[in-house]
């Protein structure tokens, strides 16, 4: 019975697999319903999508988006019954290629890429609408041959509408007051022609006056030019008979606190430098004594008399030369000045052929000092905790990505946040990746250092800057983290790499204390000296005057023989001045000291509690005698040793690295031929234990 059932089931299965299943006929009296086809929800034109494409500069996607929604209408904020019609280069109301080239070349004094995004219809008039590479929206009036800057972005364009367009105001006034006689078209055309000719002449005169200032590539060059050409008058395109008189902050009476107040009024909080102030033919002018300032990104601002806020005038100096002070009276009209022949400018200044340097905009977010510091020490805030978690992330599963991916994601998410460092005071790291700061160095630049070659993969986390100052990517120290969790600092100005810490905790506790160049700063006063370095040597000013005179340095050490001072740094080490006679109690015997004296090494004292003899070489460098003839260089000068001296004994390793093809002498590098065993995966680690810990351990035993 079971076999018969199995056979039937097998036959049924074979028959069903060979022939397709037959559908049952519909029941009598029941009609079969047609199957509904699934359809997608129709897409609707969205202004946010259009603005996002313009911000990302995805012009190919913008062209497809405009073609897909061609003919869609959006009501503008002003005036009523004013409609924006979506359309691109293939719309029926589009411009010709000749008209588009005319708009791109003949209005700004230089070529500016414009992309057609549609038209605006008001009454019986149509205005073509463009967007440039920075997101600004322009409208073209073909009747008067002029451009109007409607808004700085698309969101402002949809909110403000055509409120900056003069013909729209004139048409509304003509409709409300029909009895007012209009200007004859021929007379109006003649006025427009004269206006264009006047604008072209005034622009050429202003461009000739600003040609040397436009050749300055960065803020430092502009500051030097203003300092060298004080009281020089640069003619403006508008108002007429007005000029910019170059003056420094001291001439204008601008203090550092006032410049910081100006900086806080900006959205980006970028550093600003004064260019001068406006002077007219008559003192009784609205623009008299208006101060002009330039930001670190090249943006030009105006400071009105009696106000603490800055007004943005132009995106860069070349744009300021084109518009002058017209934005102060809400004049956003661009006359057609035609193509500018720069042959005369090239003869006067050949460097003008170089393009104006466009610096990347870096936005910094600085919290208040009370939320950053607690009793003079940086708080371990939530941003620090998030950085620690991303720094020390481990892979719990073998298929999960490496820990550097989490660190990169966190740095990109918190780009622009400023975190205070333990040292130096009021210095911190601004988080961000290389794209955020515009760091475009080749990896070969970093692979020239042996410590970075052995570090494996490197991750960029930010730049070091002073509080409320945006770092300069060309000169600011760069902070890198290796795959092992070690922190490095690359200084472009010195072309050196410093090892800041072997872990996140060591980096947070020490800050930039391993960067030796900070300890060779010039002497300022006792207050700054105590706040920065925390030593007790009172004669630092006299010592700074004789750093390169070895005889006087030895005389100072002999005059202070027997006196004890506290060295800088967190380990409480004491240095005692003295000669080799009093150093006999140390482990270094007379024979070793005699051999070192023949090599021009002189004993200047010893350190406690490590009880190590300190020597000065023939060039003024400071060395410490560890054991036998093992010497370690601690500093380049006696001043740097007093300021930093005890730091090496807490973290005994090599800190400073020069390129492999360089023969420069670096601090904290063993100078003897003794080879110490490797205690770590990296070459820059000298010992796995701290000398201070070993000394305290033997003392306790």
UniProtKB/Swiss-Prot annotation:
- Which gene does this sequence derive from? UL29
Q: Does the keyword Transcription regulation apply?
A: no
Q: What does this protein do?
A: Contributes to activation of immediate-early gene expression.
Q: Which InterPro entries match?
A: US22-like
Q: Where is this region: Disordered?
A: 1-33
User: Is Zinc given among the entry's keywords?
Assistant: no
| The protein's name | Protein UL29/UL28
- This protein's major location comes to virion
Keywords, comma-separated and alphabetical: Early protein, Host cytoplasm, Host nucleus, Virion
- Cellular component annotations (GO), alphabetically ordered: host cell cytoplasm; host cell nucleus; virion component
Tell me the subunit arrangement: Interacts with UL38 and host HDAC1; these interactions are necessary for the HDAC1 interaction with UL38. Interacts with host MTA2.
Taxonomic superkingdom: Viruses
């Amino acid at each position: 019975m079971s076999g018969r059932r199995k056979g039937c089931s097998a036959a049924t299965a074979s028959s069903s697999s060979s022939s397709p299943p037959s559908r049952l006929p519909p029941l009598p009296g029941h009609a079969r319903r047609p199957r509904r086809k699934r359809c997608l929800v129709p897409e609707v034109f969205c202004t946010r999508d259009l603005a996002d494409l313009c911000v990302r500069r995805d012009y190919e996607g913008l062209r497809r988006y405009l073609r897909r929604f061609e003919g869609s209408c959006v009501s503008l904020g002003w005036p009523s019954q004013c409609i924006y019609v979506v359309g691109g280069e293939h719309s029926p109301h589009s411009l010709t290629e000749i008209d588009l080239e005319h708009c791109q070349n003949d209005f700004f004094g230089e070529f500016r890429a414009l992309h057609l995004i549609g038209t605006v219809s008001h009454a019986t008039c149509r205005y073509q609408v463009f967007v440039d590479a920075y997101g600004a929206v322009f409208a073209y009036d073909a009747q008067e041959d002029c451009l109007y800057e409607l808004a700085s972005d698309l969101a402002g364009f949809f909110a403000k509408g055509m409120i900056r367009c003069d013909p729209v105001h004139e048409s509304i006034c003509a409709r409300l007051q029909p009895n007012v006689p209009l200007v004859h078209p021929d007379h109006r055309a003649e006025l427009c022609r004269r206006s264009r000719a006047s604008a072209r002449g005034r622009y050429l005169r202003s461009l000739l006056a600003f040609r040397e200032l436009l050749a300055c590539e960065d803020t430092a060059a502009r500051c030097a030019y203003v300092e060298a050409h004080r009281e020089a008058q640069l003619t403006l395109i508008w108002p007429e008979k007005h000029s910019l008189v170059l003056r420094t902050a001291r001439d204008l009476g601008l203090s550092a606190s006032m410049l910081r107040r100006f900086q806080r009024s900006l959205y980006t909080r970028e550093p600003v430098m004064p260019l001068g102030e406006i002077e007219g033919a008559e003192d009784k002018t609205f623009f008299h004594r208006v101060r002009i300032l330039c930001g670190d990104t090249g943006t030009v601002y105006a400071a009105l008399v009696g106000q603490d806020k800055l007004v943005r005038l132009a995106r860069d100096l070349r744009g300021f030369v084109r518009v002058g002070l017209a934005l102060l009276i809400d004049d956003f009209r661009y006359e057609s000045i035609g193509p500018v022949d720069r042959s005369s400018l090239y003869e006067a200044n050949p460097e003008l052929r170089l393009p104006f340097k466009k610096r990347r905009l870096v936005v910094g977010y600085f919290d208040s000092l009370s939320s950053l510091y607690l009793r003079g020490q940086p708080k371990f805030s939530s941003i620090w905790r998030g950085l620690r978690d991303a720094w020390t992330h481990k892979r719990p599963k073998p298929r999960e990505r490496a820990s550097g991916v989490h660190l990169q994601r966190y740095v990109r998410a918190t780009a622009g946040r400023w975190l205070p460092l333990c040292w130096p005071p009021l210095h911190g790291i601004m988080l961000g990746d290389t794209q955020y700061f515009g760091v475009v160095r080749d990896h070969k630049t970093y692979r020239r250092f042996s410590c970075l070659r052995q570090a494996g993969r490197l991750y960029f986390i930010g730049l070091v800057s002073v509080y409320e100052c945006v770092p300069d990517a060309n000169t600011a120290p760069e902070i890198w983290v290796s795959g092992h969790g070690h922190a490095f600092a690359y200084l472009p100005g010195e072309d050196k790499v410093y090892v800041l810490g072997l872990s996140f905790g060591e980096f947070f506790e020490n800050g930039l204390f391993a960067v030796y160049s900070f300890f060779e700063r010039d002497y300022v006063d006792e207050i700054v000296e105590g706040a920065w370095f925390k030593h007790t040597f009172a004669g630092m000013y006299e010592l700074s005057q004789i750093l390169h005179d070895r005889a006087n340095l030895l005389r100072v050490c002999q005059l202070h023989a027997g006196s004890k001072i506290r060295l800088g740094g967190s380990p409480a080490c004491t240095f005692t001045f003295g000669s080799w006679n009093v150093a006999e109690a140390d482990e270094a015997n007379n024979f070793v000291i005699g051999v070192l004296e023949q090599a021009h090494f002189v004993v200047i004292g010893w350190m406690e509690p490590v009880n190590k003899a300190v020597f000065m070489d023939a060039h003024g460098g400071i060395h410490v005698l560890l054991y036998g003839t093992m010497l370690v260089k601690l500093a380049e000068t006696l001043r740097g040793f007093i300021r930093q001296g005890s730091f090496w004994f807490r973290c005994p390793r090599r800190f400073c690295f020069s390129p492999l093809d360089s023969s420069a002498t670096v601090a904290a590098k063993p100078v003897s031929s003794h080879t110490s065993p490797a205690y770590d995966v990296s070459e820059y680690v000298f010992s796995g234990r701290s000398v201070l810990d070993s000394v305290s351990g033997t003392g306790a035993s």
